[in-house]
Amino acid sequence: VTLGPKLKLPSFATTPVTTTPGFYRVSEVYDGDTIAVQMDGRTEKVRMIGVDTPETQKPNSPVECGGPEASDFAKKQLSGAEVRLEADRINQNRDRYDRLLRYVYQKDGTLFNKLLISEGYGTPYTTFPFEKKVEFVRAGESAKLANKGVWAGVCNLTEQNGRVKSNA
């Protein structure tokens, strides 16, 4: 069956980024839930799905309680490391800031998004649907019961539109 000549895409067309299976080197850790990786000769910003850490880098916003600790934890765990990225079938490919939305797995198989939550460095970000939502919410409940990280009583936390925010 012949479908006709191949179409040539105009030069301004961009190819959507699909994460090829494999590991990618983390080139920068911006904060607790955002990293950059080297992917196919370019740098891609990656926002971790389903987790929210206190802000340290948001323009015109104060540094939030627990933010520096979450950033430091992510830097210690991920700076220069190789990670495996996984998309979520029910979430978008990119967010409004053009960051890839991904689950980030460490070389040993640890799901870093969930680790941030279970260690109290972040909280489940449930504003948007994602496959591991129940798992992440349970990890957050366990961290809260154990008074870990942001749940240790130092930060005054409130929930706003599916996000837990610090008032301290």
Regions from the language model: what does each represent?
Residues V1-A168:
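Small beta-barrel nucleic-acid-binding modules, primarily SNase/OB-fold domains
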